[in-house]
Every structure is written in C-alpha cells, then in structure tokens.
Amino acid sequence: MVSLIITSYNYAQYVERAIRSALDQSLSKSEYEILVINDCSTDRTVDVLSNYTEEVRVFNLEKNLGLSGARNYGIQKAKGQFIVFLDADDYIHRDLLKVQKLFLEENTSLDAVSTDYYLVNEKGVRQRHVNAEEEPIACGIMFRKDFLYNVGLYDETFRAREEEELRIRWTKKYNIHNVIIPLYRYRMHDSNLTKNEDAMSKHQDLLQSKHKE
C-alpha cells in the first residue's frame, strides 16, 4: 500500500486542490490511502477538511510541529510500505502513484523514486518543466517506509531546509531514481516558505554546522 501524506499549515485556499488530485489517482483506491496532517492551522483549514473525513484520514494537530514534525507524524501514522509527500499548496498528476509504485516494485534495489515536475503559478498555469535531478524537491518522491526509518526521518530541529538536510543523509548510501516525466505540480506563490529569506539563511548555517564534512 501507498500512503500519500499531505501536510498543511494555513493553506485553506489550496489544500482542497491537493486533496482532489490525490483522490483522482489512477491507482486503485484499495492500493493507497490519503493522510492530511493539519499542523495547527489558524485559518479555515479545519472547515475545509471536514468535507473529506470519509475519504481521507484527517489529523488536526493541537500544537504546531513545523513541516519536519508534521511529516514525521504522518509517517508514524501511515499504514503503507511506500510513502509520498504532497505539500498542501501543490498537486499531482493522476498517474504519479501508479508509475512510482510500479517502478519500486520492479526495481527492488531502489530506495526511492522521484519524477520531474512542472512549476505552476498561483492559478495553476504551467511555467516550466523542471528536471528533478538538477533541481530536486522532497515532495512527489515515493520512498520505501523502511528507508525513511533507516535514514532517521526528518530532523525536527530544522524549520527550513529540512528537505536538504534529509537529502544529504540519504545520498550518502541510498539509491534513488528519477523518472523524466513531470508528474508533480509545484506551485509558486508569495507565501511559499522557501521565500522566507531569514529562515533559510539561519538554517543554512545550521545545515553547514551539522554536515561539516
């Protein structure tokens, strides 16, 4: 089984699109589950998610854990042996889970599989096809759950650059393959965490300190 984990913090205006793309997968419904981790949002996220409680496993956290903590929480609640992360402001092509699951099942030496992605604007209009090997992101990658536990999950001391920190650890001894089909949609908008320059700068120093070698 595949566990698709959507993490959301104050993305009520986007999370419904993410959920709809998850529900619309070509993979059989019996082969995957959807978990939404609401990281103590203060907007209308709870109200939006209340419409999907029969189709989606919703977890409304009482304390904000940050992206790393919310993803780790989702991993611990997941029933599947394969894990995929979807940020609440992004969405996915309907064949993402089917393609990645088939690839991992037929290539047992691989620990994870990614795909290329499209950058889209706030309205969802495609801007650019991105090669995920050249410009990697953590979302839209299907991991074996055992791999995530072996590599040590996300470091919850990181409130930014957590994906880079995890990537440094996994590239040292694990195998990941990229499929050159753009099956993930990465939305660019003004409130993206990656645009918080102060947080990114602070955690760049933390990243360098942890991985001096």
Name the predicted role of every residue range.
Residues 41, 208-213:
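Membrane-interface aromatic/basic loop that binds lipid-linked glycans or pyrophosphate carriers
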Residues 1-203:
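Nucleotide-sugar donor-binding/catalytic module of glycosyltransferases
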